[in-house]
């Protein structure tokens, strides 16, 4: 860790608290981070500082957004600041603060930032048991919004498994197209719509299926969520820190598909650089949003807005996200 830069970062935090922060100080600090250090921990500390609303508003009001963002993107890349490090960082910063209020059966179930990260690590352990010596799994999600599907998505993004959320409004032909093109090896299925879609195409696909619920209704090679999640105890060699250090920044991490209303669905690829730089860019574009705000998850997480702005955006800002299951599922 670069002690000189760490002291400068601490000084900026003090300036924020006393409302004495200046844009010139921030520019000097980010330039120093770029020119002086390659230490990941120091750069990550700076990137944590950079999501502060006071910092964002200072840069925004000084009309330095473009210059600032270009430098941030540079630091994100050279320090390998991917989704896993972002989630770990928010867990440390916001700790017991609630990240999700899940409305279920007229009751609100809460998940804290610290608990979310613990659940993601446990889910990562279970996912690691799907690996074989000659095969790295590609994960598909065919489900309505629910906590367990979020855990799968975020664990894949944190530890490097490619993950593909599939639109529930797909036709069976389009579902088959997506499964074949993306080479999904393991499909997590949930809800009535997801079950119906999978059962229609199951005879022509050799894919392992994990059921979020109602596994008896699914055709094919199916295991329950409970069985899958219990497998984490078999992941003796899973090391979250080591796994995160291997995640590449500029390779395809996830694919999101269009609805395919005019032809076959179009797959849009995203790298970790795409995912993380977009969070900082969105933060700079919306300087009034801060950790005291609440989000409502009203779009499906196979939709870019629902997944990136509502889910990942709320986590980036340190907000509270309200969500409830689809009434149809």
Label each region the model flagged:
Residues 96-133, 137-146, 150-154, 171-179, ...:
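Conserved AMP-binding/adenylate-forming core of the ANL superfamily
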Residues 95-98, 233-257, 264, 288-294:
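Conserved pre-ATP/AMP-binding loop-to-beta segment of ANL
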Residues 153, 170-200, 276-296:
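Conserved ATP-dependent adenylate/AMP-binding module captured primarily in the ANL superfamily
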Residues 276-294, 301-324, 328:
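Conserved AMP-binding/adenylation subdomain of ANL enzymes
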Residues 4-32, 195-249:
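ANL superfamily adenylate-forming
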Residues 60-69, 86-112:
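AMP-dependent adenylate-forming
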Residues 109-114, 246, 253-279:
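Conserved AMP-binding A3 loop
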Residues 117-125, 235, 249, 268-288, ...:
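Conserved structural elements of the adenylate-forming
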């Amino acid at each position: 860790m670069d002690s000189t830069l760490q002291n400068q970062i601490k000084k900026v935090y003090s300036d924020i608290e006393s409302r004495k922060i200046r844009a010139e100080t921030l520019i000097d600090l980010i330039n120093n981070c770029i020119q002086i250090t390659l230490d990941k921990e120091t750069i990550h500390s700076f990137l944590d500082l950079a999501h502060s609303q006071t910092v964002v508003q200072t840069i925004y009001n000084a009309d330095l957004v473009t210059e600032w963002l270009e430098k941030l993107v540079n630091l994100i890349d050279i320090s390998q600041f991917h989704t896993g490090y972002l989630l770990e960082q928010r867990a440390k910063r916001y700790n017991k603060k609630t990240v999700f209020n899940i409305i279920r059966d007229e009751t609100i179930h809460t998940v804290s930032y610290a608990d979310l990260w613990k659940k993601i690590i446990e889910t990562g352990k279970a996912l690691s048991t799907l690996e074989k010596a000659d095969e790295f799994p590609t994960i598909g999600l065919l489900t309505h919004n629910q906590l367990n599907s979020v855990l799968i998505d975020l664990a894949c993004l944190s530890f490097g498994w490619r993950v593909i959320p599939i639109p529930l409004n797909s036709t069976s032909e389009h579902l088959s197209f997506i499964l074949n093109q993306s080479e999904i090896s393991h499909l997590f299925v949930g809800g009535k719509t997801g079950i119906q879609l999978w059962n229609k195409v199951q005879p022509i696909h050799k894919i392992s299926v994990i059921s979020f619920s109602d596994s008896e209704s699914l055709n094919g090679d199916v295991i329950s969520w409970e069985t899958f999640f219990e497998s984490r105890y078999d992941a003796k060699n899973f090391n979250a820190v080591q796994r995160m250090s291997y995640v590449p920044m500029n390779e395809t991490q996830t694919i999101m598909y269009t609805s395919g209303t005019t032809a076959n669905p179009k797959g849009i690829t995203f790298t970790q650089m795409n995912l993380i730089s977009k969070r900082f860019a969105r933060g700079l574009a919306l300087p009034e949003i801060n950790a005291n705000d609440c989000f409502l998850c009203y779009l499906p997480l196979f939709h870019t807005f629902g997944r990136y702005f509502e889910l990942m955006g709320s986590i980036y800002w340190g907000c509270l996200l309200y969500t409830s299951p689809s009434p149809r599922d």
